[in-house]
Amino acid sequence: MTLPVWVAAAARAATEALLGRPFSASQLLELPDRDEPLAVSVTSAAVLAGGEQALAISHCDPGSGLDLTRGLEIWVCVQWQELVDDELNVHSEAWLNLLAGKGVGTLGSGGEACVSRFARELLSRNLYPLVPSGRGLQLEVVLPRGRDLAARTSNAAFGVVDGLALIGTQADVQVSASPDQLQQTIEQLRRQSAASDFCGAMTLVIGENGLDLARQLGLAAQPLLKIGNWLGPVIVAAAEAGVEQLLLLGYHGKLVKLAGGIFHTHHHLADGRLEVLAAMAVREGLPLDLIRQLGQADSMEAALKMLEAQDPELVRKLWYRLAVTVEHRSAAYLARYGSWSIAIGAALFDRQRRLRWAGPQGSQQLAVLGVTPEDSPISLSLP
Protein backbone atom coordinates (compact mmCIF):
# COMPACT_ATOMS: atom_id res chain seq x y z
CA MET A 1 0.00 0.00 0.00
CA THR A 2 1.12 3.57 -0.66
CA LEU A 3 2.24 5.91 2.12
CA PRO A 4 -1.10 7.84 2.33
CA VAL A 5 -2.92 4.60 3.22
CA TRP A 6 -0.70 4.01 6.24
CA VAL A 7 -1.06 7.65 7.29
CA ALA A 8 -4.85 7.37 7.07
CA ALA A 9 -4.86 4.18 9.15
CA ALA A 10 -2.82 5.81 11.92
CA ALA A 11 -4.99 8.94 11.72
CA ARG A 12 -8.16 6.89 12.17
CA ALA A 13 -6.68 4.96 15.10
CA ALA A 14 -5.60 8.22 16.77
CA THR A 15 -9.05 9.76 16.27
CA GLU A 16 -10.72 6.69 17.77
CA ALA A 17 -8.39 6.98 20.78
CA LEU A 18 -9.36 10.64 21.13
CA LEU A 19 -13.01 9.51 21.21
CA GLY A 20 -12.18 7.11 24.05
CA ARG A 21 -12.68 3.98 21.99
CA PRO A 22 -10.58 0.84 22.59
CA PHE A 23 -7.53 0.36 20.40
CA SER A 24 -7.93 -1.72 17.25
CA ALA A 25 -4.76 -2.92 15.54
CA SER A 26 -6.67 -3.35 12.27
CA GLN A 27 -8.32 -0.26 10.81
CA LEU A 28 -10.97 -0.65 8.09
CA LEU A 29 -10.47 2.10 5.52
CA GLU A 30 -12.83 3.28 2.80
CA LEU A 31 -10.73 3.83 -0.32
CA PRO A 32 -11.58 6.12 -3.24
CA ASP A 33 -10.35 3.54 -5.76
CA ARG A 34 -11.93 0.42 -4.21
CA ASP A 35 -15.46 -0.82 -3.64
CA GLU A 36 -14.63 -2.86 -0.53
CA PRO A 37 -13.05 -1.58 2.71
CA LEU A 38 -9.41 -2.45 3.29
CA ALA A 39 -8.00 -3.65 6.62
CA VAL A 40 -4.75 -1.81 7.41
CA SER A 41 -2.60 -2.59 10.43
CA VAL A 42 -1.65 -0.02 13.07
CA THR A 43 1.06 -0.54 15.70
CA SER A 44 -0.29 1.45 18.65
CA ALA A 45 -2.45 4.37 19.79
CA ALA A 46 -2.77 6.32 23.04
CA VAL A 47 -4.19 9.54 24.47
CA LEU A 48 -1.88 12.37 25.52
CA ALA A 49 -2.10 15.64 27.43
CA GLY A 50 -4.86 14.45 29.72
CA GLY A 51 -7.03 13.30 26.85
CA GLU A 52 -6.70 16.51 24.81
CA GLN A 53 -4.59 14.79 22.15
CA ALA A 54 -4.03 11.29 20.81
CA LEU A 55 -1.12 9.68 18.99
CA ALA A 56 -1.08 6.58 16.79
CA ILE A 57 1.79 4.84 15.05
CA SER A 58 1.86 2.69 11.93
CA HIS A 59 4.65 1.26 9.77
CA CYS A 60 4.58 1.51 6.00
CA ASP A 61 4.59 -1.74 4.01
CA PRO A 62 4.69 -1.00 0.26
CA GLY A 63 4.38 -4.67 -0.69
CA SER A 64 6.80 -6.84 -2.63
CA GLY A 65 8.41 -4.04 -4.63
CA LEU A 66 11.60 -2.17 -3.85
CA ASP A 67 10.59 1.03 -2.06
CA LEU A 68 12.51 3.28 0.32
CA THR A 69 9.40 3.72 2.53
CA ARG A 70 9.49 0.07 3.61
CA GLY A 71 9.26 -0.08 7.41
CA LEU A 72 8.94 3.70 7.66
CA GLU A 73 7.50 4.65 11.05
CA ILE A 74 4.53 7.03 10.85
CA TRP A 75 3.26 9.12 13.77
CA VAL A 76 -0.09 10.89 13.61
CA CYS A 77 -1.14 13.23 16.41
CA VAL A 78 -4.71 14.57 16.50
CA GLN A 79 -6.72 17.01 18.59
CA TRP A 80 -10.12 18.70 18.28
CA GLN A 81 -10.53 22.26 17.06
CA GLU A 82 -13.57 24.53 17.15
CA LEU A 83 -15.18 25.63 13.89
CA VAL A 84 -17.50 28.41 12.79
CA ASP A 85 -20.74 27.55 10.98
CA ASP A 86 -19.46 27.87 7.41
CA GLU A 87 -16.58 25.46 8.15
CA LEU A 88 -18.75 22.55 9.27
CA ASN A 89 -19.41 21.08 5.82
CA VAL A 90 -17.16 18.22 4.69
CA HIS A 91 -16.88 19.83 1.26
CA SER A 92 -15.29 22.98 2.72
CA GLU A 93 -12.26 20.96 3.90
CA ALA A 94 -11.84 23.52 6.70
CA TRP A 95 -12.84 20.91 9.27
CA LEU A 96 -9.48 19.16 8.73
CA ASN A 97 -6.32 21.10 9.57
CA LEU A 98 -3.41 19.06 8.23
CA LEU A 99 0.02 20.00 9.60
CA ALA A 100 3.38 18.89 8.27
CA GLY A 101 5.40 17.61 11.20
CA LYS A 102 9.05 16.61 11.15
CA GLY A 103 9.98 14.58 8.10
CA VAL A 104 6.93 15.52 6.00
CA GLY A 105 7.71 17.41 2.80
CA THR A 106 6.39 20.92 2.31
CA LEU A 107 6.02 23.11 -0.77
CA GLY A 108 8.95 25.39 -0.09
CA SER A 109 10.49 26.13 3.28
CA GLY A 110 7.72 26.62 5.83
CA GLY A 111 5.01 26.01 3.24
CA GLU A 112 2.00 23.73 3.23
CA ALA A 113 2.34 19.98 3.50
CA CYS A 114 2.79 18.36 0.09
CA VAL A 115 -0.26 16.09 -0.01
CA SER A 116 -1.93 14.60 -3.08
CA ARG A 117 -5.65 14.90 -3.77
CA PHE A 118 -5.96 11.14 -3.27
CA ALA A 119 -4.38 11.40 0.20
CA ARG A 120 -6.72 14.22 1.24
CA GLU A 121 -9.78 12.35 0.00
CA LEU A 122 -8.62 9.25 1.85
CA LEU A 123 -8.33 11.19 5.11
CA SER A 124 -11.67 12.90 4.57
CA ARG A 125 -13.57 9.67 3.90
CA ASN A 126 -12.22 7.93 6.96
CA LEU A 127 -12.05 10.73 9.53
CA TYR A 128 -15.04 12.98 8.88
CA PRO A 129 -17.60 10.39 10.09
CA LEU A 130 -15.73 10.24 13.43
CA VAL A 131 -15.61 13.98 14.09
CA PRO A 132 -18.30 15.22 16.52
CA SER A 133 -20.76 17.82 15.26
CA GLY A 134 -19.46 21.38 15.56
CA ARG A 135 -15.82 20.34 15.76
CA GLY A 136 -12.90 20.03 13.44
CA LEU A 137 -9.77 17.95 13.61
CA GLN A 138 -6.16 19.09 13.72
CA LEU A 139 -3.90 16.37 12.37
CA GLU A 140 -0.11 16.44 12.46
CA VAL A 141 1.89 13.81 10.59
CA VAL A 142 5.47 13.06 11.65
CA LEU A 143 7.87 10.82 9.73
CA PRO A 144 10.93 10.45 12.00
CA ARG A 145 13.15 9.24 9.13
CA GLY A 146 11.42 11.31 6.46
CA ARG A 147 14.07 13.96 5.98
CA ASP A 148 16.90 11.42 5.68
CA LEU A 149 14.96 9.33 3.16
CA ALA A 150 13.95 12.42 1.17
CA ALA A 151 17.63 13.13 0.54
CA ARG A 152 17.65 9.96 -1.59
CA THR A 153 14.83 11.22 -3.81
CA SER A 154 14.47 14.03 -6.35
CA ASN A 155 11.76 15.78 -4.29
CA ALA A 156 13.79 18.97 -4.03
CA ALA A 157 13.84 19.23 -7.81
CA PHE A 158 10.13 19.91 -7.63
CA GLY A 159 10.00 22.32 -4.72
CA VAL A 160 9.33 19.73 -2.01
CA VAL A 161 11.65 20.28 0.96
CA ASP A 162 12.26 19.00 4.50
CA GLY A 163 10.87 15.49 4.00
CA LEU A 164 8.78 12.99 2.08
CA ALA A 165 5.68 14.09 0.20
CA LEU A 166 2.39 12.34 1.01
CA ILE A 167 1.65 11.62 -2.60
CA GLY A 168 0.03 8.81 -4.54
CA THR A 169 -2.96 8.51 -6.84
CA GLN A 170 -4.16 5.13 -5.63
CA ALA A 171 -3.94 2.71 -2.72
CA ASP A 172 -1.65 0.19 -4.39
CA VAL A 173 2.01 0.91 -5.00
CA GLN A 174 2.98 1.17 -8.66
CA VAL A 175 6.21 -0.81 -8.72
CA SER A 176 8.45 0.83 -11.30
CA ALA A 177 11.03 -1.95 -10.95
CA SER A 178 8.61 -4.85 -11.47
CA PRO A 179 8.21 -6.86 -14.71
CA ASP A 180 4.45 -6.25 -14.60
CA GLN A 181 5.00 -2.50 -14.64
CA LEU A 182 7.39 -2.88 -17.57
CA GLN A 183 4.81 -4.83 -19.55
CA GLN A 184 2.15 -2.20 -18.86
CA THR A 185 4.51 0.54 -20.04
CA ILE A 186 5.35 -1.33 -23.26
CA GLU A 187 1.67 -1.93 -23.99
CA GLN A 188 0.96 1.77 -23.53
CA LEU A 189 3.88 2.64 -25.82
CA ARG A 190 2.50 0.35 -28.53
CA ARG A 191 -0.94 1.93 -28.26
CA GLN A 192 0.50 5.44 -28.57
CA SER A 193 2.69 4.55 -31.55
CA ALA A 194 -0.20 2.77 -33.31
CA ALA A 195 -2.47 5.82 -33.13
CA SER A 196 -3.57 7.21 -36.49
CA ASP A 197 -2.07 10.63 -35.75
CA PHE A 198 1.31 9.35 -34.51
CA CYS A 199 4.07 11.28 -36.29
CA GLY A 200 7.03 9.10 -35.31
CA ALA A 201 8.29 11.20 -32.38
CA MET A 202 7.91 10.38 -28.69
CA THR A 203 9.27 11.56 -25.34
CA LEU A 204 10.08 9.11 -22.55
CA VAL A 205 9.95 10.78 -19.14
CA ILE A 206 11.21 9.22 -15.94
CA GLY A 207 8.61 9.26 -13.18
CA GLU A 208 5.65 11.48 -12.32
CA ASN A 209 7.89 14.48 -11.67
CA GLY A 210 9.42 14.25 -15.12
CA LEU A 211 5.96 13.99 -16.69
CA ASP A 212 4.81 17.12 -14.89
CA LEU A 213 7.87 19.07 -16.03
CA ALA A 214 7.47 17.85 -19.63
CA ARG A 215 3.96 19.25 -19.73
CA GLN A 216 5.11 22.57 -18.27
CA LEU A 217 7.81 22.81 -20.93
CA GLY A 218 5.23 22.30 -23.67
CA LEU A 219 6.48 18.89 -24.78
CA ALA A 220 2.98 17.43 -24.95
CA ALA A 221 2.81 18.30 -28.66
CA GLN A 222 4.11 14.76 -29.16
CA PRO A 223 3.24 11.64 -27.13
CA LEU A 224 4.62 11.58 -23.58
CA LEU A 225 5.19 8.24 -21.89
CA LYS A 226 6.03 8.01 -18.21
CA ILE A 227 8.42 5.15 -17.54
CA GLY A 228 9.92 3.62 -14.43
CA ASN A 229 13.37 2.14 -14.14
CA TRP A 230 13.37 -0.26 -17.12
CA LEU A 231 14.83 2.23 -19.59
CA GLY A 232 16.69 -0.27 -21.76
CA PRO A 233 13.76 -2.57 -22.65
CA VAL A 234 11.49 0.44 -23.25
CA ILE A 235 14.00 1.97 -25.67
CA VAL A 236 14.07 -1.31 -27.60
CA ALA A 237 10.27 -1.50 -27.57
CA ALA A 238 10.08 2.05 -28.95
CA ALA A 239 12.35 1.13 -31.85
CA GLU A 240 10.32 -2.02 -32.54
CA ALA A 241 7.12 0.06 -32.54
CA GLY A 242 8.43 2.33 -35.29
CA VAL A 243 9.42 5.38 -33.24
CA GLU A 244 11.87 7.46 -35.29
CA GLN A 245 12.65 10.32 -32.89
CA LEU A 246 12.95 9.34 -29.22
CA LEU A 247 13.68 11.92 -26.53
CA LEU A 248 14.80 10.78 -23.07
CA LEU A 249 13.88 13.44 -20.49
CA GLY A 250 14.96 12.94 -16.90
CA TYR A 251 16.55 14.22 -13.72
CA HIS A 252 20.32 14.28 -14.08
CA GLY A 253 20.72 11.94 -11.12
CA LYS A 254 18.84 9.27 -13.08
CA LEU A 255 20.05 9.72 -16.65
CA VAL A 256 23.69 9.88 -15.60
CA LYS A 257 23.44 6.13 -15.02
CA LEU A 258 22.83 5.57 -18.73
CA ALA A 259 26.17 7.22 -19.47
CA GLY A 260 27.70 4.37 -17.47
CA GLY A 261 25.78 1.71 -19.36
CA ILE A 262 23.27 1.15 -16.55
CA PHE A 263 19.85 0.72 -18.19
CA HIS A 264 17.87 -0.45 -15.17
CA THR A 265 18.08 2.57 -12.91
CA HIS A 266 16.41 1.57 -9.62
CA HIS A 267 18.74 2.62 -6.80
CA HIS A 268 18.43 -0.76 -5.08
CA LEU A 269 19.77 -2.52 -8.16
CA ALA A 270 22.35 -0.14 -9.59
CA ASP A 271 23.94 3.18 -8.72
CA GLY A 272 27.44 4.29 -9.72
CA ARG A 273 26.38 7.88 -10.42
CA LEU A 274 29.37 9.59 -8.86
CA GLU A 275 31.71 7.04 -10.41
CA VAL A 276 30.26 7.80 -13.86
CA LEU A 277 30.59 11.53 -13.23
CA ALA A 278 34.22 11.09 -12.17
CA ALA A 279 34.93 9.06 -15.32
CA MET A 280 33.42 11.83 -17.46
CA ALA A 281 35.60 14.33 -15.59
CA VAL A 282 38.71 12.31 -16.46
CA ARG A 283 37.76 12.33 -20.14
CA GLU A 284 37.14 16.08 -19.95
CA GLY A 285 40.63 16.61 -18.49
CA LEU A 286 39.64 18.01 -15.10
CA PRO A 287 42.44 18.41 -12.52
CA LEU A 288 43.12 15.28 -10.46
CA ASP A 289 42.34 16.99 -7.14
CA LEU A 290 38.95 18.06 -8.46
CA ILE A 291 38.19 14.55 -9.69
CA ARG A 292 39.01 13.18 -6.23
CA GLN A 293 36.57 15.65 -4.69
CA LEU A 294 33.88 14.55 -7.13
CA GLY A 295 34.32 10.93 -6.14
CA GLN A 296 34.03 11.82 -2.46
CA ALA A 297 30.93 14.04 -2.77
CA ASP A 298 27.85 13.06 -0.76
CA SER A 299 25.51 13.32 -3.73
CA MET A 300 25.22 14.32 -7.36
CA GLU A 301 23.81 17.67 -6.30
CA ALA A 302 26.73 18.31 -3.95
CA ALA A 303 29.17 17.43 -6.73
CA LEU A 304 27.41 19.77 -9.14
CA LYS A 305 27.45 22.68 -6.68
CA MET A 306 31.13 22.16 -5.98
CA LEU A 307 31.97 22.23 -9.67
CA GLU A 308 29.83 25.28 -10.41
CA ALA A 309 31.48 27.19 -7.57
CA GLN A 310 34.91 26.57 -9.09
CA ASP A 311 34.36 26.74 -12.84
CA PRO A 312 30.85 27.15 -14.33
CA GLU A 313 32.12 26.80 -17.91
CA LEU A 314 33.80 23.52 -17.04
CA VAL A 315 30.49 22.29 -15.66
CA ARG A 316 28.80 23.12 -18.97
CA LYS A 317 31.35 21.06 -20.87
CA LEU A 318 31.20 18.16 -18.43
CA TRP A 319 27.43 17.90 -18.48
CA TYR A 320 27.29 18.30 -22.23
CA ARG A 321 29.74 15.42 -22.51
CA LEU A 322 27.51 13.43 -20.19
CA ALA A 323 24.40 14.15 -22.30
CA VAL A 324 26.27 13.15 -25.46
CA THR A 325 27.43 9.95 -23.77
CA VAL A 326 23.86 9.11 -22.73
CA GLU A 327 22.82 9.38 -26.38
CA HIS A 328 25.75 7.27 -27.59
CA ARG A 329 25.35 4.57 -24.93
CA SER A 330 21.60 4.38 -25.59
CA ALA A 331 22.24 3.88 -29.30
CA ALA A 332 24.86 1.23 -28.53
CA TYR A 333 22.46 -0.55 -26.17
CA LEU A 334 19.81 -0.60 -28.87
CA ALA A 335 22.26 -1.90 -31.50
CA ARG A 336 22.75 -5.06 -29.44
CA TYR A 337 19.16 -6.07 -30.18
CA GLY A 338 18.69 -5.07 -33.82
CA SER A 339 19.05 -2.40 -36.46
CA TRP A 340 16.48 0.38 -36.56
CA SER A 341 16.32 3.88 -38.00
CA ILE A 342 15.83 5.85 -34.79
CA ALA A 343 17.47 8.96 -33.35
CA ILE A 344 17.78 8.96 -29.55
CA GLY A 345 18.16 12.30 -27.79
CA ALA A 346 18.85 13.08 -24.14
CA ALA A 347 17.73 16.10 -22.10
CA LEU A 348 18.52 16.53 -18.40
CA PHE A 349 17.06 18.80 -15.71
CA ASP A 350 18.45 19.67 -12.29
CA ARG A 351 16.98 19.80 -8.77
CA GLN A 352 15.60 23.29 -9.36
CA ARG A 353 13.41 21.98 -12.20
CA ARG A 354 15.51 23.74 -14.81
CA LEU A 355 16.10 22.06 -18.15
CA ARG A 356 19.86 22.46 -18.22
CA TRP A 357 21.56 20.15 -20.70
CA ALA A 358 20.89 18.20 -23.88
CA GLY A 359 22.99 16.23 -26.34
CA PRO A 360 23.05 17.02 -30.08
CA GLN A 361 20.05 14.81 -30.85
CA GLY A 362 18.21 16.02 -27.78
CA SER A 363 18.79 19.66 -28.70
CA GLN A 364 17.45 19.08 -32.22
CA GLN A 365 14.33 17.34 -30.97
CA LEU A 366 13.70 20.02 -28.35
CA ALA A 367 14.13 22.74 -30.97
CA VAL A 368 11.35 21.21 -33.06
CA LEU A 369 9.11 21.62 -29.99
CA GLY A 370 10.28 25.18 -29.42
CA VAL A 371 12.31 24.41 -26.29
CA THR A 372 15.96 25.32 -25.60
CA PRO A 373 18.05 24.07 -22.64
CA GLU A 374 19.53 26.77 -20.41
CA ASP A 375 23.08 25.58 -21.01
CA SER A 376 23.17 25.41 -24.79
CA PRO A 377 25.91 23.15 -26.20
CA ILE A 378 26.24 25.14 -29.44
CA SER A 379 29.60 26.72 -28.55
CA LEU A 380 31.07 23.57 -27.05
CA SER A 381 33.16 20.96 -28.82
CA LEU A 382 34.24 17.55 -27.67
CA PRO A 383 37.59 15.89 -28.38
UniProtKB/Swiss-Prot annotation:
Enzyme Commission code: 2.1.1.195
Matching InterPro entries: CbiD, CbiD_sf
Biological processes annotated in GO: anaerobic cobalamin biosynthetic process; methylation
Keywords, alphabetical: Cobalamin biosynthesis, Methyltransferase, S-adenosyl-L-methionine, Transferase
Membrane is among the record's keywords: no
GO function term, MF aspect, one: cobalt-precorrin-5B C1-methyltransferase activity
Catalytic activity: Co-precorrin-5B + S-adenosyl-L-methionine = Co-precorrin-6A + S-adenosyl-L-homocysteine
Associated pathway: Cofactor biosynthesis; adenosylcobalamin biosynthesis; cob(II)yrinate a,c-diamide from sirohydrochlorin (anaerobic route): step 6/10
A Pfam family that the UniProt record links to this protein: CbiD
SUPFAM superfamilies: CbiD-like
Protein family according to the UniProt entry: Belongs to the CbiD family.
Record-given protein name: Cobalt-precorrin-5B C(1)-methyltransferase
Organism: Prochlorococcus marinus (strain MIT 9313)
Lineage start: Bacteria, Bacillati, Cyanobacteriota, Cyanophyceae, Synechococcales
